[in-house]
Amino acid sequence: MTGEMMLKSKFARAAAMASGVAAMVVATASPAFATNKTVDIGYGYGTFIDDGDLFKVCDTQKDGKGVYGAVFYNSYFTTSGYKRVMTVSDGGDAGCDQKGYDIGNSGTYTFVVCWGFYPTSPFMTASMGYPCSHTGEFNE
C-alpha cells in the first residue's frame, strides 16, 4: 500500500468514527418523538393523541373537583425556559373535554395533568406534593 492510500484509508476510518459519535450524541440528546401518551392521576387522566395533536382530559370522580391539563413548551431557539401554551379542563359533566394544539419540532413539550387546579410548571408530580403527573418531554 502506498503512503497516499494509507492516508486515505486512515482518513476514511476517522470520518466514519466521527459520524458515528455524532449520531450517538444526537440520539441520546433528543426528546422522545410524539406518540399517544396517557397520564393517569387516579382522579382522572389526560391523553395526548398524536394524530391531530389533540389533548384530552377526563374527570373520572364525582368529587366536585375537576381534572386540569396544561401543555408547556421550551423552544430550542430561546433560553427563557418552559412556557405554558395551552390549557384544557374537564369536570362536572359527562364525557371528556379536549383541545387541539399543533406540536412542532423546534422545541420540547410536556403535558401535565392535575386534580383540582391548572398546572403551573412542566414537571409537577405527586412526589413533589401535588396531585399531578406529566408525560415527560416530547416533540414531533
What are the residue ranges of the model-derived segments?
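N-terminal prepro-regions of secreted/extracellular proteins
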Residues: 1-47
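Post-signal peptide N-terminal regions of Sec-secreted extracellular proteins
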Residues: 33-140
